[in-house]
Each structure stands twice: as structure tokens, then as C-alpha cells.
């Protein structure tokens, strides 16, 4: 028989003494997170695991959700969000989105004062939330350092492994169900501390030895992302900003105009000579910044320069061609035939056979300049992945170029999505910008043939130089690391296609 509930009032978290606790139970929305609403995160699941159409249905249903939440029950409002966002989606896709997309948005929303209290707990940190466990568990464990999540469990069809849109018994974890979950988890040893932000949290806070309310205040701030338990290096998803109701409305109002603008930006510039495109970009609202000395084209009979870039989007080689004002060949992995056909510059697909690829690139360098991105994949955050050393074996005429871009509404890269649409999403941004900084050609003493350096030394040196210019941190992470985290595969074309065919 469970203990009777106690009627208590709780002091604000500002009165919580700076001391360590052995165990803590804390709510998520409005407590550990600054935002009290879980709508943006359900919207992300609806769009990224479902579709833009599902996201639109969720947005249009928001008035019904609010009415149900305020005038019927908190549980019903959340059930509606879950049904629209989850119904018919494979649970594996929801898990991938939770790990690859939601963590970045959750991490940017962590409330400083409550996280500091939560983090001081020495032994047992539990998050109790009305949100589905599948949504929040990767974030809570990997970035908050939580030990367990007590939340709503999603019902899954065992035959199709798709979410039904309903929840398992006892239902959405709110009010007294949170209290019962805490009692089941902790038994007679109640948590030392309970944190909540609303009246329905009083039920579980009342059985904690101490309880504090996290009130909504203008002075509340978020924790710097680098202060969390892990760094956010890789993330996926098309949306740049957290889709609050207002942001989501703006996105859907902009979508038809943005798509038409994107198509015009792509195909208007496609037939134009590269030396003119820089100016048409500015006219069409695309800001291009070019810095450093741009080498002239190679003289007849001489090998070309090897331009080595960090990789931000699939547009990197095209930006180099525009900056140089001439056609330039690029090599790439994981690109469709249609993308190769529509590319405004010559693009050669590599095979990941080291010997064959090296021979092919040497042939291309004999004919002219060549662009290569040795990271092998894009990275959105201010980090550089490990540079493959193959490029250092090909030429001593190496020109590093530091690339960066800004996107305000949509991300022009994806792991789980269709890569063909990457440039279109980039150009759907109202005012996208790109920066290319040409660095000095590598001195002879820093090359393989002229200076006796190993290919790995050259690759690490180029990575360090580019990272220094951009202010990015150099890492040893690879394409495989990124795709295993975000896509559940090793990043090879055949693996990606196999993963998608199973979805």
C-alpha cells in the first residue's frame, strides 16, 4: 500500500542550498529545460520521422491540443500530440530521430540553475516526465548524465514494429502516476530531492525528502552546450531553429515561396559562366565572401592545383569554382547519377577503392585543377573530422581552403533524408551565406615528395591550418562515426540503401 499524498508547498529552486545529494528526481519540461512546452519536440518527430505534411497536421491541431490540455486534462493534450506525431511510424525511425535530431535542440534548452542542482547529485539521478521515454532517453543519459528516465511508454505493433499512436498502461505519466512511478523505482528509500515546475508535479515531489519549484522567470538562462556531459558534434534534421508554434507557422508560410525561390536560384545560375555567378548570387540574396589569394589556372602542360577543403555542404566545390571564376573538377562519394548530371561543374564519383581512386585523381590533376574534401562527409558544428591522407600522396601543389556557411531556416545536409534535395534546402533559406578563404599553397617542406613528410603528417597539418583559420576544433572522428550515430549504418552507399530499404 502506497503512502498517502501530503499537501505541501515548495520553496523556489533559488533557495536550494549548494550541497550534494545522493538521489534526485526531476521533471523535464520547464524544470531541467527552460521551455515548458514539449510541442517543438513532437513537431521535430512529426517532421523528421514522418513528413512535412504530418508536421502541418500537428501544427493545425495545436488549438485542439491547448483546449484539451487546459480544460480537459494534461494527459489528453499530450495523448493528442503523441498520436499525431507517432502513429504509423516505425519505432526505429523515432529512436534515430531522438538520438540524431532531438538531442541538439534539447541541449540548447537546458536551464542553468536546475541543471547545476541536478548535476550535483552523487549517486542516482532520475528524470520523471510525461514525454515518451523513446524521445528523451538518449538526451537525458548522454547529455544530462541521468541514470534513468521514468516516462510515458509508447504502444508498438509487434508485427510491423510501428507506433500505434497510443500509450501503454498506466497512461501518460502525469500527476499521481509520477508519484507511483517514483515509489516503484525508489521503494522505501525516497529521493533526497525533487524538482518540478507545475502543480501536477507536487504529487511526486511530496514524497521526496526535499522539494523545490522551478518557476518561470525572465532571468533564467541556459547552460552552455559545452558544459553538458558530451559535446554535440553530429546531428541531423532539416530544421535549423527549434519549431515553436510561431517558428513552425513561419516555416510553413515560407515553404511554398522558399521552394520556388530555391528552384529559381539553382536553375537560373546553372547555365551561367562561373565568373558571373558571384554577382547573380548577390542579386538573388545569396551572400558570398571570398578571402585570400586565388591561384591562376595551370599553364598548358603543367599539372593542376589540388584544392583541399573542409566539408560543410555539397555546394563546397561549386563555391570554389565560382570563387575562381572557372570550371573545376571535383571528386565525391555517395552521389546520385541525377546529381552528377545536374552539377554545374565536372563531378567524378569515387569508388572507395584506394588504388583505383588515387589513379583516377592523378589523371584528373594532369588535366587541370581538382577539388577534394578529405573529411569524406559534412560536419555542421565547429569541428573538423579526420582528414584522409590519400590526397597528400597525389600532389605537392596543395592549396588548403577554409569553408563555412550560414543557414537560418533549413539545413542543406542530411544523413537520413534524400541527398538530392540538399542544395534545394540550402537555397530555400531566405538569406544563406557562404565563405571561402584561400590559404597559401603548402610549402615544399610540408609535402610528401618535396619535404619527405608522411601522408598522415601532411593531412594533419592541413587539417590544423584550416581549423586555425575557422576557429574549429580538430578531431579524429570519421565519416563512419557520424553515420553510425545518426543513421545506424557505416556511411557506405550500399549500407545507406540497405538501411532505407528496411525502413
Curated annotation (Swiss-Prot):
- Chief location of this protein? membrane
User: What does the record give as EC number?
Assistant: 2.3.1.198
Motif placement: HXXXXD motif:
311-316
Offer an example of a GO molecular function term for this protein.
Answer: glycerol-3-phosphate 2-O-acyltransferase activity
GO CC annotation, single: membrane
Q: How does it sit in the membrane?
A: Multi-pass membrane protein
Q: Which Pfam families match?
A: Acyltransferase, HAD_RAM2_N
* Alphabetical list of InterPro entries matching this protein: HAD_RAM2/GPAT1-8, HAD_sf, Plipid/glycerol_acylTrfase
Which reactions is this enzyme annotated as catalysing?
A: sn-glycerol 3-phosphate + an acyl-CoA = a 2-acyl-sn-glycerol 3-phosphate + CoA
SUPFAM superfamilies listed in its UniProt record = Glycerol-3-phosphate (1)-acyltransferase
**Disulfide bridges in this chain:** none
Source domain of life is Eukaryota
**Membrane spanning segments where?**
42-62, 64-84, 244-264
About its domains, the entry says: The HXXXXD motif is essential for acyltransferase activity and may constitute the binding site for the phosphate moiety of the glycerol-3-phosphate.
Outline what the protein does. Esterifies acyl-group from acyl-ACP to the sn-2 position of glycerol-3-phosphate, a step in cutin biosynthesis.
Write down the PANTHER family for this protein, in alphabetical order: ANCIENT UBIQUITOUS PROTEIN (PTHR15486), GLYCEROL-3-PHOSPHATE 2-O-ACYLTRANSFERASE 4 (PTHR15486:SF61)
Sequence similarity: Belongs to the GPAT/DAPAT family.
Give the protein name, as stated in the record.
Glycerol-3-phosphate 2-O-acyltransferase 4
Record organism: Arabidopsis thaliana (Mouse-ear cress)
Gene label: GPAT4
Amino acid at each position: 500500500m502506497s503512502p498517502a499524498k501530503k499537501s505541501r508547498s515548495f520553496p523556489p529552486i533559488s533557495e536550494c542550498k549548494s550541497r550534494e545529494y545522493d538521489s534526485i528526481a526531476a521533471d523535464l519540461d520547464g524544470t531541467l529545460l527552460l521551455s515548458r512546452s514539449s510541442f517543438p519536440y513532437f513537431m521535430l518527430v512529426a517532421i523528421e520521422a514522418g513528413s512535412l505534411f504530418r508536421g502541418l497536421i500537428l501544427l493545425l491541431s495545436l488549438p485542439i491540443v491547448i483546449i484539451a490540455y487546459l480544460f480537459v486534462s494534461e494527459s489528453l493534450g499530450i495523448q493528442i500530440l503523441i498520436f499525431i506525431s507517432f502513429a504509423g511510424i516505425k519505432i526505429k525511425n523515432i529512436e534515430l530521430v531522438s538520438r540524431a535530431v532531438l538531442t541538439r535542440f534539447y541541449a540548447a534548452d537546458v536551464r542553468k540553475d536546475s541543471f547545476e542542482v541536478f548535476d550535483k547529485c552523487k549517486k542516482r539521478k532520475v528524470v520523471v516526465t510525461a514525454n515518451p521515454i523513446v524521445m528523451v532517453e538518449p538526451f537525458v543519459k548522454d547529455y544530462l548524465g541521468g541514470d534513468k528516465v521514468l516516462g510515458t511508454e509508447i504502444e508498438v505493433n509487434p508485427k510491423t514494429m510501428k507506433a500505434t499512436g497510443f500509450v501503454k498502461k498506466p497512461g501518460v505519466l502525469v500527476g499521481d502516476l509520477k508519484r507511483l512511478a517514483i515509489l516503484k523505482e525508489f521503494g522505501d528509500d525516497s529521493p533526497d530531492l525533487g524538482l518540478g515546475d507545475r502543480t501536477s508535479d507536487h504529487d511526486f515531489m511530496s514524497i521526496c525528502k526535499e522539494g523545490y519549484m522551478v518557476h518561470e522567470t525572465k532571468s533564467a538562462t541556459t547552460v552552455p552546450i559545452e558544459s553538458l556531459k558530451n559535446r554535440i558534434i553530429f546531428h541531423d534534421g532539416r530544421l535549423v531553429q527549434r519549431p515553436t508554434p510561431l517558428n513552425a507557422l513561419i516555416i510553413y508560410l515560407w515553404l511554398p515561396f522558399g521552394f520556388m525561390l530555391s528552384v529559381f536560384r539553382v536553375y537560373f545560375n546553372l547555365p551561367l559562366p562561373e565568373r558571373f555567378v558571384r554577382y547573380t548570387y548577390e542579386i538573388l540574396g545569396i551572400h558570398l565572401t571570398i578571402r585570400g589569394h586565388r591561384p591562376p589556372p595551370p599553364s598548358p602542360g603543367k599539372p593542376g592545383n589540388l584544392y583541399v577543403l573542409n566539408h560543410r555542404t555539397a555546394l563546397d566545390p561549386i563555391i570554389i569554382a565560382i570563387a575562381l571564376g572557372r570550371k573545376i573538377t571535383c571528386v565525391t562519394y555517395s552521389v546520385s547519377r541525377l546529381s552528377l548530371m545536374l552539377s554545374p561543374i565536372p563531378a567524378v564519383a569515387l569508388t572507395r577503392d584506394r588504388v583505383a581512386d588515387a589513379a583516377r585523381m592523378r589523371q584528373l590533376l594532369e588535366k587541370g585543377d581538382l577539388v577534394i574534401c578529405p573529411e569524406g562527409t559534412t560536419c555542421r558544428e565547429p569541428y573538423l573530422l579526420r582528414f584522409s591522407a590519400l590526397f597528400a600522396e597525389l600532389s605537392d601543389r596543395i592549396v588548403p581552403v577554409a569553408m563555412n556557411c550560414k543557414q537560418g531556416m533549413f539545413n542543406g545536409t542530411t544523413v537520413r533524408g534524400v541527398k538530392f534535395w540538399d542544395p534545394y534546402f540550402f537555397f530555400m533559406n531566405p538569406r544563406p551565406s557562404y565563405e571561402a578563404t584561400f590559404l597559401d599553397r603548402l610549402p615544399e617542406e610540408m609535402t610528401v615528395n618535396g619535404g619527405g613528410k608522411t601522408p598522415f603528417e601532411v593531412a594533419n597539418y592541413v587539417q590544423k591550418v584550416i581549423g586555425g583559420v575557422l576557429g574549429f576544433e580538430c578531431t579524429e572522428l570519421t565519416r563512419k562515426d557520424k553515420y553510425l550515430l545518426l543513421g545506424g549504418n557505416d556511411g557506405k552507399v550500399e549500407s545507406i540503401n540497405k538501411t532505407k530499404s528496411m525502413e
